[in-house]
Design a protein with these regions (language model features):
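Histidine-centered, metal-coordinating catalytic motifs and their short helical/loop contexts
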Residues: 1-5
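ATP-dependent helicase/translocase motor core
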Residues: 8, 19-296, 305-321, 334-338, ...
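Short, charged, amphipathic alpha-helical segments
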Residues: 11-15
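Conserved nucleotide-binding/hydrolysis micro-motifs of P-loop NTPases
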Residues: 164-166, 198-201, 304-306, 344-347, ...
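Conserved SAM-binding loop
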Residues: 245, 299, 367
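A short hydrophobic beta-strand->loop->alpha-helix junction that borders the nucleotide-binding pocket
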Residues: 300-304, 327-329
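SF2 helicase catalytic motif II
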Residues: 355-391, 396
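Interdomain helical connector at the RecA1-RecA2 junction of SF1/SF2 helicase-like NTPases
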Residues: 402-477
């Protein structure tokens, strides 16, 4: 039952009803209660609605007529479907209504449901496009599935939709042709999307390879993307010596900037503990900001203490920038230039309804201690945001998991590495000396029952952290 104050739109209710129908039909078919998969028939929906009140009985009941036809064998060993309903997501129109419309709404777009209707700041459907290739469009006219317009009436993006049974690539060429025609007419090239509802790819006009995105960009995101097309490569590396004055720090920044100039969007720096990973990230942010590459930055760490420490350092060296912490601030400033958060807090934000941050809200995400467990447990963060992504770690290259390199789009090596041994040889770190110590805890071990409530809470936090770092599932002890 819907108990919230927000009214459910008729279209959303219709989509949910259809989805529920197919879930129920699938169960009934696999339990052999029905002989074939049924198609959803919208004509059976009553047009004269009366309000229905939920029953006070919380226990669901099942009709004996149904259970008598379902054998225990069918329930325990259900047969996979051998037929498909005639009405399904295979229809391009249904793909748009069930999947693409929903994604656009989540991104803040209001969809105009009258074909060809165009209003500033809204998503238009079946938009007439003139100047198409007459070899494939004899009249020279085509109709774009969606065009997203700026508040001033300029096309910010065009979307070509295909049904779920087709690859989104089948719509790529057509989407590009729509963009060509819109650019000739309006003087601005729209961002291009092509999608089948499950996989969506974007061509942003900045010469990056086509890339997959989880959803569509908001109105403000698209305006920022188009503005970024005017930025140049970073050729003058004005690195602030007050932040990073050591040679290896400057080399790390230069290596990463050169990598980004070559149209890569992800990178990894390996710097031994104590050699200034945070300072390097601050200096990199200042350099990218000065060259108009970034506006908003998200810094992620796995512990609140590390988030606080990072924010303190950023505030020290970039005092004029607005900063906030999602993990600590009572009322975080979500529009701040620099946002600091633990991974778990950010997961909560991107799972919130309504969505707290659009997919293009951040231009750069910095990951403190990038390794497999972070990508495994919190990978949804990096799938959700469409941004530059830089990983920092003290883990030596030889110990970095292959999947980490793949997720950062690297060929089994970081963009730059500065090892512990190099830091000692250069005089930036001192070698350690091992001193053997003993204690009651080492001799007797930790007995949970002997701990105070405060110690138990601390131990549980340590255990949760270790599980997260080692990728241990929640249900394993």
């Amino acid at each position: 039952a819907h108990t919230g104050a927000q009214q459910v739109k008729a279209n959303d209710a219709f989509i949910c009803l259809r989805a529920l129908f197919y879930v129920a039909t699938g169960f009934l078919y696999r339990w052999q209660a029905i002989r074939k998969m049924l198609a959803f028939d919208a004509t059976l929906i009553p047009q004269d609605f009366t309000q229905i009140h939920a029953s006070d009985n919380s226990e669901p009941t099942v009709s004996p007529d149904l259970t008598d036809h379902v054998s225990s064998e069918a329930i325990n060993h259900p047969e996979p479907p051998k037929s498909q309903p005639s009405e399904s997501l295979e229809s391009e129109a249904i793909t748009r209504q069930c999947l693409i419309d929903y994604m656009l709404n989540e991104a803040g777009w209001e969809i105009l449901h009258v074909k060809g209707d165009i209003q500033g700041g809204k998503a238009a459907i079946e938009v007439k496009i003139e100047g198409m290739n007459k070899q494939f469009h004899p009249s020279g006219i085509g109709y774009a599935d969606y065009v997203l317009f700026s508040k001033g009436g300029k096309p910010l993006a065009v979307i070509e939709a295909k049904s779920t049974i087709h690859s989104p690539e089948t719509g790529r060429k057509q989407a590009i042709e729509y963009a060509d025609c819109l650019e000739k007419k309006h003087g601005v090239r729209p961002v291009i999307y092509y999608t089948n509802g499950y996989t969506t790819k974007v061509i942003d006009g900045m010469d990056y390879p086509d890339r997959e995105v989880i959803s569509f960009h908001s109105h403000d995101d698209l305006e920022q993307l188009i503005q970024k097309r005017g930025r140049a490569d970073i050729t003058h590396l004005m690195i602030d010596d007050e932040i990073t004055n050591r040679p290896y720090q400057k080399t790390a920044i230069k290596s990463l900037v050169e990598w980004l100039n070559r149209k890569h969007r992800r990178g990894l720096l390996v710097l031994a503990t104590g050699t200034g990973k945070t300072r390097v990230s601050i200096s990199l942010c200042k350099l990218l900001d000065n060259n108009n590459w970034i506006k908003r930055v998200l810094f992620l760490a796995d512990r609140t203490e590390l988030v606080k420490q990072a924010r303190k350092n950023f505030e020290k060296y970039l005092p004029s920038q607005t900063m906030t912490s999602l993990s600590d601030d009572t009322e975080p400033n979500k529009s701040a230039r620099f946002v600091f958060s633990t991974y778990q807090t950010m997961i909560n934000y991107i799972n919130a309804e309504p969505v707290e941050f659009s997919i293009g809200h951040f231009d750069l995400i910095i990951i403190d201690e990038a390794h497999r467990s972070v990508f495994g447990k919190y990978g949804a963060i990096f799938q959700y945001f469409d941004s530059l992504l830089i990983g920092l770690t003290a883990t030596p290259r030889a110990e970095i998991d292959k999947n980490t390199f793949q997720l950062l789009e690297l060929e089994n090596e970081p963009n730059f590495e500065y090892t512990y041994d190099e830091a000692i040889a250069d005089g930036y770190l001192c070698p350690y000396r091992l001193k053997k110590c003993n204690s009651k805890m080492i001799n007797r071990g930790i007995r949970y029952d002997d701990l105070s409530p405060e110690q138990r809470e601390q131990l549980e936090k340590v255990w949760e952290y270790e599980k997260a770092m080692k990728g241990i599932p929640e249900d394993e002890e």
